[in-house]
Amino acid sequence: EINKYFEYENNFSQKIHSLKDKINTVADLETYSTELQALEKELTIFHSKVVMDIVKNTNKKIDFVGFHGQTIFHDPSKKISKQIGDGKLLSQLTRMTVVYNFRQNDIQNGGEGAPLAPIFHKALVKQIKIELPVCILNIGGISNVTIIGDYEQNHFTSRDLGPGNCLIDAWVRKNKKGNFD
């Protein structure tokens, strides 16, 4: 079992937040594309080192890597969510199968861009045998909710609710010069 936390160096975290703060529209993605590409490569290399550290320190067979990347812009109303992180490069660096681009595919199919949360919530509720119906609140950077009504009928729904920890993180970065999340 691996119980380890892999933190971005402060300088790298600042670069991510600085670039994210500049990108407020779809057009900004093009304006800052050179910076995005450089940061994406740096992030992917960091994640490849994390994957290799995990592989080295476990005796478990790893079938594939799920790679979310780092959200830099998100606007489901315009059917776009941009994460930096190159799944193909991560696959090359780790020599493993990498599954990626979760959010954009979900948005293109009418979702909010968080396709894994409801699937995980449904499996968790079923495994620990929670009585239905149930509502699960996930407070991450953006809060989302999963409502599960019935397993047999596959009756469940999920959606974003609004800001979660991102507001606290932004306040701490601005006022305390540190990181919350």
Locate predicted features.
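Conserved non-catalytic scaffold segment of RNase H-like nuclease domains
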Residues: 2-42
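Glycine-rich phosphate-binding loop and adjoining helix at the ATP-binding site
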Residues: 61-119
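Residue-level signal for well-ordered alpha-helical scaffold segments within enzymatic catalytic domains
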Residues: 49, 53, 89-92, 123, ...
